[in-house]
């Protein structure tokens, strides 16, 4: 969008659904991006919705605010009367996203019906909607993780250091390395160790699994991704709650 509208300002705002459980580095990068490119940003707060009694926080060892984002997201989209929301989802990430259209229609409740999707022939997209409905538009649906990194290398676009190898205190839970943080309650047998890791996908600290890696440059990451046999969301604990976890959330209005 920045390149498409340059030298003019991007005419639409960014929307961040803030769970309050973010990596601090992600928020620093978000604020830098907004200021550097003179962008507008709206922030929907999950914590505010909890405080107002609109949603209830999960409890227990695997508690996460991931699902709670849906209510806040739909509320913000309704307030803004948006016709469409642009996202970076890709089909190679997860099986539910693999069958989603470029123009993903959402009904008046913000819900997605995977059995009622519109045909998309070549580059022809149907943008018709009724009042109260909207679209989630995913321009890079057919890109792979490797495509993304090759593009970033070509554009030399600045990125948060979370994507590059760094030392962090982590512990293992159900085969996933999780960052040690104040938002996660550890079990007695979960031991914290400092490891050299990086993030392949970034969400809440409570559900973002990290990967052991020494890739400290984009070129090294490209080599690593090219030989990887696991998808980037393979470390996301929120996708492991059930076989259809992502699809169930998307039906409710998730990203």
Task: Place the predicted regions along the sequence by residue.
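Nucleotide-activated chemistry modules centered on ATP-dependent adenylation/adenylyltransferase
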Residues: 1-255
């Amino acid at each position: 969008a920045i390149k498409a509208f340059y030298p003019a300002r991007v005419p639409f705002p960014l929307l961040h659904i803030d769970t309050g459980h973010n990596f601090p580095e992600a928020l620093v990068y978000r604020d830098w991006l907004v200021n550097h490119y003179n962008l507008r940003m709206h922030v929907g707060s999950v914590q505010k919705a909890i405080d107002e009694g609109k949603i209830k926080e999960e409890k227990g060892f695997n508690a996460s605010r991931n699902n709670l984002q849906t209510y806040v997201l739909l509320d913000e989209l309704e307030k803004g009367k948006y016709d469409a929301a642009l996202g970076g989802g890709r089909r190679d990430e997860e099986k539910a996203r693999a069958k989603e259209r470029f123009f993903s229609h959402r009904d008046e409740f913000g819900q997605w019906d995977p059995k009622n999707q519109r045909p998309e022939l070549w580059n022809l997209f149907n943008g018709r909607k009724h009042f109260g409905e909207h679209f989630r538009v995913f321009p890079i649906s057919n890109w792979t993780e490797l495509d993304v990194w090759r593009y970033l290398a070509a554009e030399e676009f600045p990125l948060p250091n979370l994507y590059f190898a760094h030392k962090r205190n982590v512990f293992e839970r159900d085969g996933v390395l999780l960052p040690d943080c104040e938002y996660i309650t550890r079990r007695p047998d979960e031991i914290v160790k400092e490891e050299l890791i990086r993030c392949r996908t970034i969400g809440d600290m409570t559900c973002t699994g990290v990967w052991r890696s020494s890739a400290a440059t984009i070129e090294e990451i490209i080599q690593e991704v090219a030989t990887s046999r696991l998808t980037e969301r393979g470390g996301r604990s929120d996708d492991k709650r059930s076989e259809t976890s992502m699809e169930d959330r998307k039906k409710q209005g998730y990203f």
